[in-house]
C-alpha cells in the first residue's frame, strides 16, 4: 500500500509511473476522498476545540440558568461533531479500500515496457546441453518412466493435478530437502513451516486481497484461503509487530504446497507440470532495513541462482519491465531455466523487492533504537525454487537416449545413492 501523504504530495508523478505498468489506474477518487477527509477533519477538530473552550467557560458559571441557550447550542455542536466523525469513518474506510487496490510504484531503474517482450536480459549461466537425439518433453519422459501419472491425477481431482510415483515422488522430496539444506546451511536462512491455510488479513497484508480474490481457493463456510505461495504466511509472521533494527535482516525459508486457480491460463501449458493448481515451492523471504534493501535483493537473487548452479542447469536472469511486474513489486528479477524439450527458457523463480508496500499493509515496522519513531521495513521474497519446475528441468536436461534420466550429483545423497532413473 502506498503512503497516503506521499500520494497526496506526488499525485501526478505517481499516476505517470503507474501508467507505465499498462493498467488504467485513476487516482481521481483518492483525491476526492482525501480532500473530503481533510475538510471533515478540520471542521470536526475546530468544533471540538470550540466545544471544549465553551464547556470550560460554562463549568465556571455558578448560575446555569443564565446560560441555557449556550448549553443547548453546545449540545447541537456535539450532535454535529458525531455526524462529522461518523462520515469521517466512512470516508476513511473507503479511502483505505482505494489505497488497497493501487499497485506499487515501479523503482526508477525498472525498464519501461508493456509485456515480457520488453524484459531485459541481465546474464546467462551455463550452456544448454546438446543431444545426439531429439530431446523429449518432460511429460513424455515422466510417463515413459512411470514416475508421473497425469491421467490418475486428473481422475483423483481434475485437470492440472498430477500423481507422482516411486522415483518421481522421491525426486520431488529430494529437491525440497536439498533446497532447504542449501538455504539454511550455506545461506543462513531460518527454516519455517507455516500453516498452508491463512486468514483474510494475511492475504491482504501481502497484496493478494482485495484485488485478486477470484484467483484464490477460498474455503467454504469459513473465511480462510489456501495459500498461493509461502510468501503469504511467512511475510505475515511479523504482521503488526515492531522489530529491532539490530536484528535486521531477518531471512526465512519455507517449503509449502501452493494452490492457484490459474484463472486466465486456459489453453496455456495444458500438458505436464509447468502450470498446476497444486505445486510445491521453497520460498525465501527477507525483512530488511530500507537503506540496504536493494543490496539484499541481489543477495536473495544469488541465493536462488545457486540452486540451479549446484544442479548444473543452464539459466538466464531477466529484469522485468514495468508492464510485466506483479501488483506488489517495486522491482523484480525472474530466473528462467533452459528446457530442451520446449527449446526455450521458462520461469522457475521470481525475486522481488516490495519496499514498504507490504509492510505498510501489514504494519511491520522497526526501530533504530528505543527512542526512535517506528519505520516500515522493506520486504523481499523469491522462489528458491519452484520444485515441480526444477524436476521438469532435471528430466529434460538429464535425459538419455534410452529414456532414462541421470540424477545430478548433488541430489544422489538425497536419493539413497541412486544415479539414474530407468
Curated annotation (Swiss-Prot):
Cell compartment(s), UniProt: Cytoplasm
GO molecular function terms noted in the UniProt entry: ATP binding; serine-tRNA ligase activity
Binding site for ATP: 260-262, 347-350
Native source species: Geobacter sulfurreducens (strain ATCC 51573 / DSM 12127 / PCA)
Principal location class: cytoplasm
EC number(s) stated in the UniProt entry for this protein: 6.1.1.11
Pathway: Aminoacyl-tRNA biosynthesis; selenocysteinyl-tRNA(Sec) biosynthesis; L-seryl-tRNA(Sec) from L-serine and tRNA(Sec): step 1/1
One GO BP annotation of this record: seryl-tRNA aminoacylation
GO terms for cellular component: cytoplasm
InterPro entries: aa-tRNA-synt_IIb, aa-tRNA-synth_II, aa-tRNA-synth_II/BPL/LPL, Ser-tRNA-ligase_type_1, Ser-tRNA-synth_1_N, SerRS_1_N_sf, SerRS_core, tRNA-bd_arm
TM stretches of this protein: none
Keywords carried by this UniProt record: Aminoacyl-tRNA synthetase, ATP-binding, Cytoplasm, Ligase, Nucleotide-binding, Protein biosynthesis
Primary enzyme class: ligase
Binding site for L-serine: 229-231, 283, 383
Similarity comment text for this entry: Belongs to the class-II aminoacyl-tRNA synthetase family. Type-1 seryl-tRNA synthetase subfamily.
Subunit structure: Homodimer. The tRNA molecule binds across the dimer.
Name used for this protein in its record: Serine--tRNA ligase
Catalytic activity: tRNA(Ser) + L-serine + ATP = L-seryl-tRNA(Ser) + AMP + diphosphate + H(+); tRNA(Sec) + L-serine + ATP = L-seryl-tRNA(Sec) + AMP + diphosphate + H(+)
